[in-house]
Amino acid sequence: PAVLPEIMRLFNQTAMEIYEGQQYDMDFEVRNNVTLEEYIDMIRLKTSVLIGCARKMGALIAGASEANAQALYETGLYLGLAFQLQDDVLDVWGDEATFGKAIGGDIMNNKKTFLLIGAMQKAQGDDANELRRWINNEYALRSEKVPAVTALYERLGMREAADEAIKRYDDMAFDALSRVEMSDEAREAFVQLIKGLVGRKK
């Protein structure tokens, strides 16, 4: 097919970006100065580009124009960002029975999420000292650490900050989707997919 070279180029580019994102994620484990901008870039590379790649490949194979294929790529990119941020939120405030795994795993592992990085940037005085104590306490009990750090997140407004970021990327995904020429039926299917992934509880 005529689109094969473009598909192979996109595949190779995406593979390299995912490797890069995974390396960033590993590097973040030993860094205490990770910024929210770096985190967003990491999840873009590790997660979002794969969703964008899948959408663009499908569009190209189906004979879509470059403009439509690129808009679908961007839809996937922003959807991936919103999806990962929602995952960060669910790990703290989700319902265990619905989420399908224990809540607070990221907190117990000091995983650099949108919530922890934002809290580290915003916390001052007693809040900063308390957050550092929990991060440095290797023997903290889940029953104590998770509620305490969750309370810190709430006090620092991190739930609201995450929800705002999710909505921003959700809106950007819909904006990109609005530029795609497709039937009303196909558009509605994409709309429901975006709503389902971003509004998920598990």
Regions found by a protein language model. Name each.
Residues P1-K202:
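All-alpha prenyltransferase/terpene-synthase fold signal
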